[in-house]
């Protein structure tokens, strides 16, 4: 019977199985984009974005050791009628 991979395991490559293709890419970098028709700029102050970065860092470090606050980048921009919140997390290299 095959063992089912969990979401975080498949994303960060923490299972014993060898990583291939997109799993290796996910190990290197996690990118999340959130789009909203409601204006985010009214709710996202610089302080709130910094708090969000710290909370995200705390969660990511439960699964991947060595991620620093400088590895988390959050950008806000408008695209057509949408507000886009883009987050990039540079992950340390996966050691085999």
Swiss-Prot record:
- Can you tell which superkingdom this protein's organism belongs to? Bacteria
According to its UniProt entry, one GO biological process term is: regulation of division septum assembly
Q: List the Pfam families.
A: MinE
Question: Which positions are tagged coiled coil?
Answer: none
Keywords of the record, alphabetical order, are:
Cell cycle, Cell division
Its biological purpose:
Prevents the cell division inhibition by proteins MinC and MinD at internal division sites while permitting inhibition at polar sites. This ensures cell division at the proper site by restricting the formation of a division septum at the midpoint of the long axis of the cell.
Q: Which family does it belong to?
A: Belongs to the MinE family.
Which NCBIfam families has this protein been placed in? Answer: minE, PRK00296.1
Q: What is this protein called?
A: Cell division topological specificity factor
| Organism expressing this protein natively | Psychrobacter arcticus (strain DSM 17307 / VKM B-2377 / 273-4)
